[in-house]
Structures are given as C-alpha cells and as structure tokens.
Design a protein with these regions (language model features):
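Hydrophobic residues in well-ordered beta-strands that form the structural core
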Residues: 8, 31, 56-58, 87, ...
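Rossmann-fold dehydrogenase core element
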Residues: 44-62, 81-86
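C-terminal helix-rich "cap/oligomerization" subdomain common to oxidoreductases
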Residues: 3-8, 212-213, 240, 249-250, ...
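Glycine-rich, aromatic-lined ligand/substrate-binding cores of catalytic
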Residues: 131-134, 148-149, 153-170, 176-194, ...
Length: 297
C-alpha cells in the first residue's frame, strides 16, 4: 500500500515481469526504454497497460530537450513545408575498444545496438516525422570476441526507411563509433527549409529557411532560451543552457503529472510499442536482407 508507483530501470529482459506485476497491483508504471526485450513482451505489456487504465510512460529522455521540442513545434506548424527527408544517428564509442570486457549489453539481441541505442533515434523519427511504413536494415558485429566472452549481438546497424508521409529516411546506430561520445543527431529537409540538431550541442539548433535574398541565405544557429518549451523553469537567461539531467527532470515531471491527472502522458506504452515494432521489423529485415513492410510484422 505504501508504493504509489513503480519505476523500471533494469535490463530489458526483466521489464515485462515487473510491469505485469505492477499493473496487477494497480500501480502506475514508468519504464525505461526499450519497452520490452521482444515485440511479444512489448505487446503484452501494452495490452496490460491499456486494460489497467493506469498511467504509464516510457523513458525516451533525449527528445525532451527544449531544442528538440522546438523542432517538433516547427514541424507541426508546417514551418519547413513538406518534409522530404530525415537523417538520424545515435553513435557512441563505449565498446569501440575490442579489449573492453563483455557485459550484459553484449548478450541477447535485445541488448545490441538495435535494442539499446536505436530506440532513442527511432522514437525521435516517429515523434518528428510520423509513422514508418517500410524499411531495409543491415547490422553487424564488429568485435565478435571480448574478454569475458563472445559477443552475441550487433555493434552497429543502419536503416533505410520510408515514412507514411512519403518522406525518405536513413538512420545509423553504433556503439563502436570511435571518438563519438554522444552522437544523437538528426537533420530534416523540407520544401521551405531544413533543421539539424546534435545532442553534443544540445542547447541549439541550426535552422535554414528558404526566404530572403539568395546572398543572405544560410543555416543560422538558434540558442535555446525562455521562449522555447520547458527551458524557463531551469534558467531565465537565453543561451545559458540546460543539461542532460534536466531532460530527466522534464520526463519525471510528466510522469508525476500523469499520476496526478490519472492519465498517460507521451510517450505511453502504446506509443512506445510503435518503436518496438520498428525494431522488430529491422531485425527481420537484417536477417532476411530484404525490405520489410511494417504492416506485415
């Protein structure tokens, strides 16, 4: 009775069991990404969440920056015109050294790059661009052996995709991208402009608008400030910036609001199931070396 909510921050192989038990006890649930270790786990968890009617949410914190929230607003308002292209990556180098010992992240397909890093950028793509209808994926294990055991999943992967809107896309994910510490970045092209964002410079975006004299056109940097979503509670001065932990605070606030209002906030389990569906399709595509229609998986 003293437990008011459950936060799941374990390896994803344990997410389903904890979530199912929490919903059975009538507790709201916040689950770290990815939702489950497999599409079956994610589907079962979502069904339980929907049946319970309890507040639920999944932790995709990187999309919470004021900069990325501003990009969502630009796109929703049609500021870039018809969007034609999305390019995203989530690249890090924490396993670039083949002498780094194997850990739980090196075992099981759900813990590889497609299960660990890809969900963050796939979530961004869905949030910014809308549903993905088809994709082609390939993945590879770069370092097959490490101290402590063999590696049983992918070190890097790439996805070509088509969105329901008709836009094309490409995403790349890597945990062996030498020199890249937090390469969560994306660029979006539209008929009236383009925008790009890089998590390593999370307090700004680069925006291009197809307007004005040709001689004065170009990408311009926009520093986030109180005029942008969720910035002012942290600082009243533009350009001073927010940090990584502030993204966590923003999503924690939304989960507390979900509990207070007794309704799920974005991204809910239902929203996050769409990320799991894309990951599942990517795994099938990589195994079959063929395009996969999301409606078929």
């Amino acid at each position: 009775p003293a437990v008011e909510a459950v936060i799941i921050a374990t390896p994803q192989t344990e997410h389903r069991e904890i979530a199912m038990a929490a919903f059975a006890e009538g507790k709201p649930v916040f689950c770290e990404k990815p939702l489950g270790a497999s599409i079956n786990d994610a589907t079962e968890m979502t069904d339980a969440a929907e049946a319970s009617g309890l507040p639920n949410m999944v932790g995709f914190n990187y999309i919470r920056t004021p900069a990325s929230q501003f990009v969502r607003k630009l796109l929703a308002n049609g500021e870039l015109g018809k969007v034609t292209w999305f390019r995203g990556e989530h690249t890090e180098d924490f396993l670039a050294d083949p002498q780094t010992p194997a850990s739980w992240r090196c075992r099981g397909m759900s813990n590889g790059t497609l299960g660990d890093l890809a969900p963050h950028m796939i979530n961004a793509a869905l949030a910014l661009m809308g549903p993905i209808c088809s994709l082609l994926c390939e993945f590879e294990t770069v370092h097959k052996e490490r101290p402590g055991g063999d590696v049983g999943n992918d070190d890097h992967a790439q996805i070509m995709c088509r969105f329901d809107s008709g836009a094309m896309g490409h995403m790349y994910f890597s945990r062996v991208a030498t020199g890249r510490k937090m390469g969560y970045a994306y660029e979006i092209h539209g008929t009236k402009g383009s925008v790009r964002f890089d998590q390593e410079d999370q307090n700004s975006i680069w925006l291009y608008r197809s307007e004005g004299p040709e001689s004065e056109r170009g990408f311009r940097q926009i520093l986030t400030g109180p005029a942008h979503p969720d910035y002012e509670p942290f600082c009243q001065g533009p350009g001073h910036g927010t940090g990584y932990q502030d993204q966590i605070i923003i999503e924690a606030r939304d989960f507390l609001l979900a509990i207070e209002e007794n309704k799920s906030h974005w991204p809910s389990f239902k929203d996050s199931l769409q990320v799991s569906r894309v990951v599942n399709a990517a795994l099938k595509s990589g195994e079959q070396r063929a395009w996969v229609d999301l409606l078929s998986v």
